[in-house]
Design a protein with these regions (language model features):
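Accessory beta-strand-rich segments of carbohydrate-active enzymes
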Residues: 1-94, 117, 136, 258-261, ...
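Substrate-binding/catalytic cleft of secreted carbohydrate-active enzymes
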Residues: 238-239, 251-509
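Extracellular ligand-binding/catalytic regions of CAZymes and related secreted enzymes
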Residues: 501, 505-514, 538, 563, ...
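Aromatic-Pro/Gly-enriched surface loop or interdomain linker
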Residues: 607-609, 621-689, 716-719, 727-741, ...
Length: 851
């Protein structure tokens, strides 16, 4: 029977008046095969991240792990009765099922009636529709009369009601009605009455968008939520969904396992729109063999029963077949991949027959455009691949900086004409449920958090470091996806329940910072700043675009507005402020202006953490508010901080002289390495900047100079560093991003005045990824090398293999951006940091003067 669908047993012949004992035997295997172990779950989970060639010879993908019943993410071989059981006692003439297909002014209904008696029954069908909150009757009348069923007969009857003016169901206004369907026999005697709680709403896929009640609808989503941990906790269900609504999140996905009646009904009450996902994540993934027919039949029949169970719930907006089956991308056998496609397509066709009122997502992570490239249009014409495209992405967590998506790249890469594009899994990392540190497997096995915050990722550090950075990337990504993707229909950010401490306990649950970042990012009307670099000098203009995104919950156009901005310190004191006029914005539209925002000219402290605050006002009413962290510094924090008595010689190949001039650093120019090290009076510091090559003689000159006590500073001269110090520097990596650098030794003098999380998003007043480094150096760690700062590529899982293999993979993705080399009596500091931004970024400037 499976794990999630309803089933019924007619026990009439087995029960008798008085006390009855009902015994149910539950078995945990199918066709005599052993239960699937959690190892199979791990195989599925890891294979999501494999390429086609990696999958084609997967020896673990054997039939044994595919001969179990679908059980979602539950990997502990669950067995037993876990959903409510009820005994129904009725008259022989009984309403067996009702399917309500609502419109905006009524509904059509499929009503199934069965006559369990041994003689013919004549009857009428009456429908009463009652407002669940007020008790007011919206409609009440017979809809079908003079009907008859023969002995043991069953039939489905269809009726339509229109011309009503119901309160519509939307996430903002989750209006519910009790639909009471009665069968009445002679003289109006009610033989049976079935009450179904539902609502009036439509949800459609049309012209490449999603429409709720006739207007475009952007899903402001977060998933998953803690159903699977606490499936029978009604208080938690209501509490969590109310927190979601307060956080401006109005949609989710039933990820990991289908929900039960308790949680779906809570979504109906609280106004949470649902993508209802199927029972078998990773079914037929990559090059796994196709399961036996009886297993597939069990899966498909149970899934259709699940759909039938929940299709009257207004919160269920669309159906998603499964999670990340991905055979369409990853099966190395093209013919087998097509056969898998046809199997799922047949299920989609069955879904449409069972529920023609809702869109279908073929698979959570399926993109029509990718299937088109692989299979061709002729094949796709023979299958049904659903309505909705869904791209899973882990930006700034597994791959890519969020700044790569500031110009609508998401829709440019993934939108197919005529199909709504969403993401049901936009992940940015996971705090644990107790302290807020990164979850253990990512922290220790995969090392993803290290890429973001270095050694602050581990349990000895303050968890607020991870919580702060994780909230930043989550909120910023959510905002940019809304700002620049007018062709997209919504994003569900992942994993929503990890944004709370003790998400499983309704008494103790507390939001983490990401909740509040997303509360701002998910405002229906969103005022949002496009910010690249995050560090500025006092008195400088903030180069930004301020957007307004109009997903107003009443679907209206916005009138011209006022944008109030302010720069405030950590105590809320306003340091600068102003007002700009903002034009009208149509519903589902977005516009931007480039305001004249100037930082305060003088700061009370030389370096300050401040916020840019935005308030959007229409006709005196505040529509949206937002805030962004910035670092500001007085120019005097860096200017003239190097002693005039310090003799500095500069070999300049990349205009570093302009930066030193800005910092009022006195220096003498040299035109060659020879001149650099043979100045008549020995220099306190020799700087080489932007030099790409040198001769063997020049290499010797530099090493000799250092050995005798000379001090060198190599700025963005990686080629020279490798040649001069081959025993210490073996190569370099050009980062895919380079916008985050982490400290190796936060107590080093070079970091005086710089916070442990400050080495990121260096500002140059340009609309480009705000690099903090240009390269990472591969260095041999030894007693003569002092590691100061490093960078690690944003990366996905580090799976399998021996410890040595894992270490090798980690080392292949990381290196040093700042190090010091001792040789003889002298030292050399080698930097790939973006210190050329010192005249626009105070952190870059402080690094340079500290060197």
């Amino acid at each position: 029977v499976g794990m999630f669908g309803d089933f019924q047993v007619d026990a009439t012949d087995f029960l008798h008046p008085g006390r009855n004992v009902v015994v149910v035997k539950v078995t945990r295997d199918i066709s005599g095969a052993a239960a699937q172990t959690s190892d199979a779950m791990e195989n599925y989970y890891s294979s999501v991240r494999k390429d086609v060639e990696d999958n084609k010879n997967d020896q673990r993908a054997n039939r044994k792990v595919l001969t179990d019943i679908p059980h979602g993410f539950y990997g502990d071989n669950p067995a037993g009765i876990w959903q409510p059981v009820k005994l129904v006692i009725s008259n022989p003439l009984k309403v067996e099922d009702v399917f309500i297909k609502p419109t905006l002014d009524g509904a059509s209904m499929d009503i199934t009636v069965k006559n369990h008696s041994a003689r013919k029954k004549n009857f009428d069908i009456r429908v009463d529709i009652v407002d669940k909150q007020t008790g007011e009757t919206l409609y009440g009348a017979p809809v079908l009369t003079k009907l008859a069923l023969t002995a043991n007969g069953e039939n489905m009857y269809t009726c339509s009601i229109d011309g009503l003016k119901p309160k519509l169901w939307e996430p903002t206004t989750p209006n519910l009605y009790d639909f009471r369907i009665s069968v009445t026999e002679s003289k109006g005697k009610v033989a049976d009455c079935l009450t179904v709680t539902s609502g009036f709403r439509t949800f459609k896929s049309k012209d490449g968008f999603l429409y709720l009640n006739g207007r475009k609808f952007w899903m402001r989503g977060g998933n998953h939520i803690p159903f699977a941990i606490c499936p029978n906790d009604s208080i938690l269900a209501d509490k969590f969904m109310q927190l979601m609504k307060a956080g401006n999140v109005q949609s989710t996905r039933t990820h990991t396992t289908p929900w039960n009646e308790l949680w779906v009904s809570a979504a109906d009450r609280n106004g949470i729109a649902i993508s209802f996902e199927g029972t078998w994540s990773w079914l037929m993934i990559h090059s796994t063999p196709i399961p036996d027919k009886n297993v597939l039949d069990l899966w498909s029949s149970e899934w259709l029963r699940v759909m039938k169970k929940y299709r009257n719930h207004p919160s269920v907006f669309f159906w998603t077949v499964n999670n990340e089956m991905k055979f369409y991308d990853l099966d190395a056998d093209m013919e087998r991949s097509k056969e898998k496609f046809r199997i799922v397509s047949d299920v989609v066709k069955g879904m449409r027959e069972l529920d023609p009122t809702r869109p279908v997502c073929f698979d959570s992570n399926y993109l029509h455009s990718k299937a088109l490239r692989r299979f061709g249009q002729d094949f796709l014409n023979t299958v049904d691949d659903g309505d909705i495209d869904d791209n899973h992405a882990y930006y700034n967590w597994y791959d890519f900086s969020l700044f790569r998506f500031f110009n609508g790249e998401f829709q440019k890469q993934f939108k197919s004409p005529g199909r709504p594009l969403i993401s049901q899994e936009m992940s940015t990392g996971y705090p644990n449920a107790e302290t807020g540190h990164p979850t253990r497997s990512y922290q220790l096995i995969h090392q993803n958090p290290y890429s973001l915050i270095g050694y602050e990722a581990y349990d000895w550090a303050d968890p607020m470091h991870f919580l702060k950075v994780q909230s930043f990337i989550t909120g910023e990504l959510a905002e940019t996806l809304r700002r620049t993707n007018e062709q997209v229909s919504g994003i569900m950010h992942f994993a929503y329940m990890t944004w709370f401490r003790q998400c499983y306990n309704y008494k103790n649950i507390q939001p983490y910072p990401t909740y509040y970042a997303m509360q701002r990012a998910m405002q229906p009307v969103l005022v949002s700043a496009e910010l690249w670099g995050r560090n500025l000098y006092a008195g400088e203009k903030l180069h930004t675009r301020i957007y307004v995104v109009n997903d107003s919950e009443d679907g209206r156009d916005l009138l011209p507005m006022a944008l109030n901005w302010s720069i405030v310190d950590e105590k809320g004191k306003i340091l600068a402020s102003g007002t700009e006029q903002f034009p009208a914005v149509e519903y589902y539209g977005r516009k931007y202006i480039e305001p004249a925002i100037v930082m305060p000219s003088v700061l009370p402290s030389d370096k300050m953490n401040v916020k840019l605050k935005l308030v959007l006002v229409e006709n005196g009413q505040t529509l949206s508010q937002n805030e962004y962290d910035l670092i500001l510094a007085n120019k005097r924090w860096n200017i003239a901080k190097v002693s005039e008595n310090k003799k500095i010689v500069l070999l300049d190949k990349d205009n570093t002289s302009a930066v030193l001039d800005f910092l009022q650093v006195k220096y003498q120019k040299a035109s060659s390495v020879k001149e650099l090290v043979q100045i008549k009076r020995k220099a306190d510091l020799c700087i080489i900047s932007g030099l790409k090559e040198c001769t063997d003689d020049e290499k010797t000159l530099l090493r000799t100079y250092q050995q005798k006590g000379g001090k060198l500073l190599l700025l963005n001269s990686k080629e020279i560093a490798k040649k001069v110090y081959p025993e210490h520097i073996t190569g370099w990596i050009i980062p895919t991003e380079g916008d985050i650098v982490v400290m190796e030794r936060d107590d080093a003098p070079v970091f005086d005045g710089i916070g442990v999380l400050d080495l990121r998003y260096f500002n140059n007043n340009k609309r480009e990824i705000p690099l903090a480094c240009h390269a990472t150096l591969k260095a041999n760690r030894n007693e003569n090398v002092t590691e100061l700062a490093g960078q690690m590529k944003i990366h996905a899982y580090i799976d399998g293999g021996k410890p040595e293999d894992r270490i090798q993979k980690i080392e292949s993705m990381r290196g040093l951006t700042l190090l010091q080399i001792k040789d003889g009596k002298g030292t050399a500091t080698v930097s790939t940091l973006c210190t050329e931004k010192a005249d626009t970024d105070p952190i870059a400037g402080k690094l340079l003067v500290n060197d």
